[in-house]
């Protein structure tokens, strides 16, 4: 039945559309921000204030952005937007990492060239530069769709000559401080990349390795062991047996001679039971036992190069955790082997080429890939009655982080940064650095503690050259004048000049024509990105910068290299706080891969739902651990978004006739409770923002909105729609709505920039700015809970009453709460002072001896649709009758 009094009601006006149309709105407001230079105005507004710098760790300029990029950049953007609103001068300077193997490999693949040595270095570098720049352009375009608070006009790229020159200054400082050295020693070597790798470029994956026990025949014994006895050796790298030149034992360990089938075998006493069980030996006999030191000097026949013998030596790295207690030594294929080998003068055999193939030193195994030679080596040992046991071992094994192929330890001449001399200084520099999560700083410290050196040379073309000249004696020259000369050239012409010019053309005049040569290797890309605190200049914001925020893998990567370089150059850490996030997995917690078909792309989410939904997912993710994404998770965030949007719609629709200049009122009663709850929300969300806990921001806001909707908004409807426009209760509600809207706009602006800008442009408030992103975030130092405590008894009563009403509706006693006659057994004096009929939104309330619900036989007011004991001849309640007079 049509309400004939409808025209007399204060019907809310739908100012904010129900449908968000985010894709269209995001383009509209992006244009608005750009045309009106909102980002620049925010910087100008805060220019004289304290700076806040979140330094952008550079993503790699290769390929489209993945969901991990979105997680990272949006987290950063939320921080920057919040700090800007809080009055800080917060420029965000994005950057790109542009050198390195993936780009080089991409060019080689496009040109259909198998080996980088089959193309001129200059041509490869030219193509790589062009490709990197095209990728920056592509990624920049994709980043901009995420509604980031930066114009992306001021950005850095590690291939810029000025940046490269700053990088060389860091190298120069290290060199002159005595931290740079060249040495032959085993390093991580990637056959798939044909280059050395630093620890930060190695990832550990499950790997299937050969596991063999082999016998080395003794040819020169002593009083403890005899000629033709056998040493038992365990290895998971049969291919390194070609380079065997020693066996190590632990001085104080006990070793036993075991007789089995008329042969004697030597291995650690503590491992006798374990090893014999592996071999399946039943009837063996322990003949004698002795210490490791008693075996030193014994010689054995090498397992592959059987024409040669090798000695037993002492080794600090021998353990009883696995194997046999005797360790096969190949000095160029293990760091401990190398160190001991140098002391004991063991032969150093390099039988592996750069690409992993076996060279002429491998005898009959030459020209085979090292891994492919394993079965043949095992067969050779078997034919020579030296293979005691063969199986496969599944274990965590180092892989090249770019190619995902296994790496090996391989001796080669490389350039290193010595970490040991500066380790104490590095550790001291992070004593006062904070981290979120809190374990971050201890993880970084542990990684620094475990480093002795940093391999910085790479045998590739696309990168910053190591600026070293060799004199006529082939000795590296470390002279400041030479470094400064090259730095000056690079700042003007870029690093291509190192490859374009001959050695004499590069040298200052007094060094020419002396038969000098130049280094061919380039620097590790982690050295590039680790130089950003020197290469990136932000006016008025010196190092250390406030926050570095990256994935948790960067504790061994960018956090690590940045810290080392900064301590060398600035004598301090480059950051005050470290924030790290996990990886993005699919909805079931699985790693994403194209083969599984579970890859979620940020551009797909943005084009379907809008960037604000993607940003809400980021803010609503517990990012300190791995996070998940998928259709269900996105839909959950869509529902939260709708709740926020619909709340704004309701609030603003009921503020159309509200004038903040004259209608703001002092609050009483239930309205004072809502004000107190709003102040609590402000206090807690500010703490959450300060602590990078964005999930708490969403959780707190969502809970506030939910509680608001479940009571106060419903309670307010009758007063808003049916009371006089100037009614005091109505103005109190609108005062709350006004303040709630203002607060929610600020809380959600860093997370939902488009939606909040849309609402802000509609909303009329005091001291309104051109954009919500030029507003000032609220400050609040304390909260009160006086009203919360006071009103607790009411909400306890409300819950009891509505539980009874639910039963009454189910039993068809009443159709709605509006028809409920509520009997309340209550002695609380505060409750007796309240207008419980209106607060509970029921037909009538009577205090009695028991709690119960009956059907209220009242009269329905045709205007407000509420039941009363009495209505007038026009079917109006007292209130409505007065309003329409």
From Swiss-Prot:
Taxonomy, superkingdom: Bacteria
UniProt binding sites for Zn(2+): 861, 864, 877, 880
Matching PROSITE patterns: AA_TRNA_LIGASE_I
Task of the protein: Catalyzes the attachment of isoleucine to tRNA(Ile). As IleRS can inadvertently accommodate and process structurally similar amino acids such as valine, to avoid such errors it has two additional distinct tRNA(Ile)-dependent editing activities. One activity is designated as 'pretransfer' editing and involves the hydrolysis of activated Val-AMP. The other activity is designated 'posttransfer' editing and involves deacylation of mischarged Val-tRNA(Ile).
Biological classification of the source: Bacteria, Bacillati, Mycoplasmatota, Mycoplasmoidales, Metamycoplasmataceae
Entry binding sites for L-isoleucyl-5'-AMP: 550
Domains (record comment): IleRS has two distinct active sites: one for aminoacylation and one for editing. The misactivated valine is translocated from the active site to the editing site, which sterically excludes the correctly activated isoleucine. The single editing site contains two valyl binding pockets, one specific for each substrate (Val-AMP or Val-tRNA(Ile)).
Reactions catalysed according to its record: tRNA(Ile) + L-isoleucine + ATP = L-isoleucyl-tRNA(Ile) + AMP + diphosphate
UniProt enzyme class: ligase
Protein name: Isoleucine--tRNA ligase
PANTHER family for this protein: ISOLEUCINE--TRNA LIGASE, MITOCHONDRIAL (PTHR42765:SF1), SOLEUCYL-TRNA SYNTHETASE (PTHR42765)
Any single Gene Ontology cellular-component annotation: cytosol
Motif ('HIGH' region): 59-69
Organism name: Mycoplasma mobile (strain ATCC 43663 / 163K / NCTC 11711) (Mesomycoplasma mobile)
Keywords, comma-separated and alphabetical: Aminoacyl-tRNA synthetase, ATP-binding, Cytoplasm, Ligase, Metal-binding, Nucleotide-binding, Protein biosynthesis, Zinc
């Amino acid at each position: 039945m049509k309400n004939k009094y409808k025209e007399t009601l204060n019907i809310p006006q739908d100012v904010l559309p129900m449908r968000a149309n985010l894709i269209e709105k995001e383009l509209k407001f992006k244009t608005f921000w750009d045309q009106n230079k909102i980002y620049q105005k925010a910087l100008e507004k805060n220019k004289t204030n304290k700076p806040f710098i979140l330094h952008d760790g550079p993503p790699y300029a290769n390929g489209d952005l993945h969901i991990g990029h979105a997680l990272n950049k949006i987290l950063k953007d939320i921080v920057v937007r919040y700090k800007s609103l809080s009055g800080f001068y917060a420029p965000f300077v994005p950057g790109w990492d542009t050198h390195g193997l993936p780009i080089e490999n991409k060019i080689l693949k496009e040109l259909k060239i198998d080996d980088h040595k089959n193309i001129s270095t200059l041509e490869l570098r030219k193509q790589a530069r062009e490709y990197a720049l095209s990728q920056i352009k592509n990624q920049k375009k994709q980043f901009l769709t995420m509604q980031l608070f930066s114009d992306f006009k001021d950005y850095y790229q590690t291939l810029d000559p000025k940046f490269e020159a700053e990088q060389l200054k860091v190298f120069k400082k290290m060199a002159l401080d005595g931290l740079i050295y060249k040495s032959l020693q085993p390093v991580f070597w990637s056959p798939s990349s044909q280059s050395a790798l630093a620890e930060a470029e190695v990832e550990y994956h499950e790997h299937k390795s050969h596991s063999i026990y082999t016998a080395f025949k003794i040819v020169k014994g002593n009083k403890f062991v005899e000629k033709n006895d056998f040493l038992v050796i365990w290895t998971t790298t049969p291919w390194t047996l070609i380079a065997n030149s020693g066996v190590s034992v632990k001085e104080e360990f006990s070793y036993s001679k075991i007789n089995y089938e008329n042969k004697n075998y030597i291995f650690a006493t503590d491992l006798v039971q374990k090893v014999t069980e592996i071999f399946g030996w039943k009837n063996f006999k322990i003949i004698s036992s002795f210490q490791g030191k008693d075996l030193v000097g014994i010689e054995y026949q090498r397992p592959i190069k059987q024409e040669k013998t090798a000695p037993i030596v002492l080794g600090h790295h021998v353990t009883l955790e696995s194997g046999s207690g005797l360790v096969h030594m190949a000095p160029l294929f293990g760091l401990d082997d190398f160190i001991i080998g140098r002391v004991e003068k063991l032969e150093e055999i390099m039988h592996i080429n750069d690409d992993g193939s076996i060279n002429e030193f491998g005898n009959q195994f030459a020209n085979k890939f090292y891994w492919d030679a394993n079965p043949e080596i095992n067969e050779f040992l078997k034919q020579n009655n030296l293979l005691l046991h063969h199986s496969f071992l599944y274990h965590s094994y180092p892989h090249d982080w770019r190619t995902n192929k296994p790496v090996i330890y391989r001796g080669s001449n490389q350039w290193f940064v010595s970490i040991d001399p500066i380790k104490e200084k590095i550790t001291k520099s992070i004593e006062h650095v904070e981290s979120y999560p809190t374990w971050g700083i201890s993880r970084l410290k542990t990684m620094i503690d475990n480093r002795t050196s940093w391999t910085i040379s790479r045998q590739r073309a696309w990168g910053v050259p190591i600026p070293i000249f060799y004199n006529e004696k082939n000795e590296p020259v470390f002279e400041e004048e030479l470094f400064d000369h090259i730095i000056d050239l690079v700042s003007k012409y870029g690093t291509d000049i190192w490859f374009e010019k001959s050695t004499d053309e590069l040298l200052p005049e007094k060094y020419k024509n002396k038969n000098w040569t130049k280094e061919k290797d380039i620097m590790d890309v982690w050295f590039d990105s680790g130089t950003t605190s020197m290469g990136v200049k932000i006016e008025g914001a010196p190092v250390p910068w406030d926050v570095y925020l990256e994935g948790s893998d960067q504790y061994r990567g960018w956090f690590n290299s940045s810290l080392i370089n900064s301590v060398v150059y600035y004598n301090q850490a480059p950051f005050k706080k470290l924030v790290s996030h996990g990886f993005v997995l699919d909805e079931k917690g699985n790693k994403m891969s194209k083969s599984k078909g579970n890859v979620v792309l940020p551009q797909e989410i943005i084009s379907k739902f809008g960037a604000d939904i993607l940003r809400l997912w980021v803010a609503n993710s517990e990012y300190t651990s791995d996070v998940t994404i998928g259709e269900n998770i996105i839909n959950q965030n869509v529902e939260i978004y709708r709740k926020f949007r619909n709340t704004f719609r309701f609030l603003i629709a009921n503020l159309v006739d509200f004038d903040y200049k004259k209608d703001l009122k002092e609050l009483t009663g239930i309205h004072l409770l809502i004000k107190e709850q709003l102040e609590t929300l402000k206090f807690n969300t500010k703490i959450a923002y300060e602590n990078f806990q964005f999930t708490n921001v969403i959780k707190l806001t969502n809970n506030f909105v939910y509680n608001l909707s479940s009571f106060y908004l419903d309670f307010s409807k009758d007063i808003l729609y049916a009371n006089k426009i100037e009614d005091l209760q109505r103005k109190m509600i609108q005062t709350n709505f006004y303040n709630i809207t203002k607060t929610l706009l600020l809380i959600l602006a860093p997370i939902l920039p488009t939606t909040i800008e849309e609402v802000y442009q509609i909303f009329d408030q005091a001291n309104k700015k051109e954009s919500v992103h030029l507003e000032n975030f609220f400050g609040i130092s304390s909260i009160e809970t006086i009203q919360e405590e006071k009103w607790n008894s009411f909400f306890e009563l409300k819950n009891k009453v509505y539980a009874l009403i639910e039963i009454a509706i189910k039993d068809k006693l009443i159709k709605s709460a509006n028809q409920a006659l509520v009997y309340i057994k209550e002695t609380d004096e505060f409750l007796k002072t309240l207008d419980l009929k209106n607060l509970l939104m029921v037909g009538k309330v009577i205090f009695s001896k028991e709690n119960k619900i009956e059907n209220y036989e009242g009269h329905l007011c045709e205007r407000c649709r509420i039941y009363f004991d009495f209505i007038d001849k026009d079917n109006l309640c007292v209130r409505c009758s007065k309003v329409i007079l």
